[in-house]
Each structure stands twice: as structure tokens, then as C-alpha cells.
Amino acid sequence: MNEKDVKTLHPGGATSPPVRTLRAGAIEINLQRSNVTVHGKPIKLTTKEFELLRELMETRGEVLSREFLLEKIWGYGKASEVDSRTIDVHIQRLRQKLGAEGGHILTVKNVGYRFDIFYNWIKFGA
């Protein structure tokens, strides 16, 4: 994993603060602006979809249980079957919106989800 600050130069030599960006393959998340692009094209996500994608990308390779995601993203305690289905529906919609790149979100049967990427992973401005 490479970490790097990306700074924008302004007239007079002043710089803006580092832009925090997560990239995996063709997916890019600008954390300051809370926006996502795939192959450079903006993707409209709900707040929960954005938070799910960010959590999955930040913990790439780790299996995240439905219970963990419900607590982290929704603030719920013990998950019920209905709550667990909420995660499944949001993941399904997120995959659809990401198109072919949605295939990087893998289901781990009876547990949860994992973001798997076979490309170079870069995290800027940590």
C-alpha cells in the first residue's frame, strides 16, 4: 500500500490541504467531497451505499460481518434477520451501480462481505 499526499497548487504558491482519496481498480472515492467515480464517471450513491463502499475499500481483503456493518453503518446493535437483509439489499444495489467493478464486492457465505481487488491498491492522503 502506498500512501501519498496529493496537494493542489494555487497562484502564489499556496497549497490546499491533501485530498483524501481511495482507489481500487477503476473505483475512486474522494473522501472530502463524498463522491465516487468509476472509470472517471460520477456514480450517484445514497449515503449508506457510500459508507458501505468506503468501509469495504478501507478494510479491503478483510471479511466484514453483517452484524459489524449494521453496527458501523446503521448504528444497530444485535442484528435480526430483517436487519441482515437490509445489508444484502444495499450491497446488491451498490454492485449494480458500480457495474463490472461491483464484482469486487464478494459475498462470504453465512458471514458477510469482503472487498477483493486484483489490481494495484493505492490510498492517498491517509
Task: Tell me what each language-model feature is.
Residues 1-24, 125-126:
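Basic, amphipathic DNA-recognition helix from helix-turn-helix-like DNA-binding domains
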Residues 1-5, 12, 62, 66, ...:
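Short, cationic motifs built from Arg/Lys/His that form the positively charged side of catalytic pockets
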Residues 1-6, 47, 96, 109, ...:
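Generic cytosolic/nucleocytoplasmic N-terminal low-complexity/intrinsically disordered segments
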Residues 5-7, 30, 90:
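Intrinsically disordered, low-complexity regions of eukaryotic proteins
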Residues 15, 55, 118-120:
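Short linear sequence elements within intrinsically disordered, low-complexity coil regions
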Residues 17, 31, 101-103:
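Hydrophobic alpha-helical context, especially transmembrane and signal-peptide helices
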Residues 22-50, 107, 114-126:
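A structural micro-motif at secondary-structure boundaries
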Residues 35, 41-47, 51-89, 93-102, ...:
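Positively charged, aromatic-enriched patches within helix-turn-helix-type DNA-binding elements
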